[in-house]
Amino acid sequence: TDNDNQNKTDDDNQNNEIIVETSKEEDKKSVKENWLEATRRIAKAKRKDKMRDDRDAFLKAYDELKGKEGSNAWIAKSTLGYKGLDIKVSDNAQKLLEFVDKMKGSWVIQKYLEDPMLTDGRKFDVRTWHLVTAFGPKKMHMFTYAEGVLRVSCTRYRNSNFDDEFTHLTNNAIQQGHPDYGKHEKNNLLDFKDLDVILSKHYKSLKGVEIKNYPRKDRPMTTENDILPRINEIVLETLKSIKDWLLPQPTQAYHLLGYDFMITNTGSVQLIEVNLTPGTSPDRLARMVSDMAEIVLDNPFVDPFKMSGSAAADHDLDRKPNSRSSNLFRYSGVVEV
């Protein structure tokens, strides 16, 4: 649990540019692996000649889904949005494009996830933090912070009435405006222990064909054994797509990223958003910075201009940093640069 400042700090300057780049590079694989809903970039009309614009692809995808099961809802959000501001959910494609064209900057339109796993009938998302380090010319290492949070909406979920932001947007900055904010859980936040309870309850509620399509058929999924490993796989895939964009000169560099996920009613982990400047509570931030510093400063400095080629390749730059057992950043994988 977090202090009362959590609602002011867990929402952050979200940058969906990573989602855009990931969808561009990994679109076919994402659909196949089922971890990223269809995502399209919408450029301002006067900048179409200079910026990728996918509105035709969006309209085609929208038409293909029309009449199929579900409401065919999509969500529009700025690539530089934050705190849930200027987000629109709608099942009307033209209204979404009209909304975007009235706004400034570059936008993305993403298929809205209509069948989320719920807690007491309410929607939630999962925020995780990931430290990416690059201390040599070959690889980026990724570490996952062990304490994630669940952000929960105030009202019961309905796959309709998409203008009701208290139902469909879990951002704390949005939810704190509802009279029931904090009624069900402090600051509308839960932790990974709570997620295990949710997963267990959900498993017990499955029937027939539902359990046939569930990732685990012998037991409930758990955060440690099922959700976090899948999250780490997805994060590593996104880093492969944007490694040159994120760390164009990856020597002696690091970056902290915040990822937002949702879990579907069938147990699938879905990437929703990536944040370049993720926020958190002051208490967690202090612990996080201390743990980050230990990992970042543990690596030896190597001047890339004095060491190159085989010397750099042979140097122990790729080693897993030593850290105290209480460090909450857990080593989660490597990406070739």
Predicted regions and their residues:
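Intrinsically disordered, low-complexity serine/threonine-rich segments
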Residues: 7-9, 22-23, 30
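A donor-sugar binding/catalytic signature common to diverse glycosyltransferases
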Residues: 260
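Catalytic core of tubulin tyrosine ligase-like
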Residues: 28-32, 38-256, 264-268, 275-277, ...
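Non-catalytic terminal/accessory segments
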Residues: 313-337
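Hydrophobic/aromatic hotspots within intrinsically disordered, low-complexity regions
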Residues: 18-20, 35-36, 42, 317, ...
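Eukaryotic N-terminal low-complexity, Ser/Thr- and Lys/Arg-rich leader segments
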Residues: 14-19, 28, 329-337
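Asparagine/serine/threonine-enriched low-complexity, disordered tracts
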Residues: 3-16
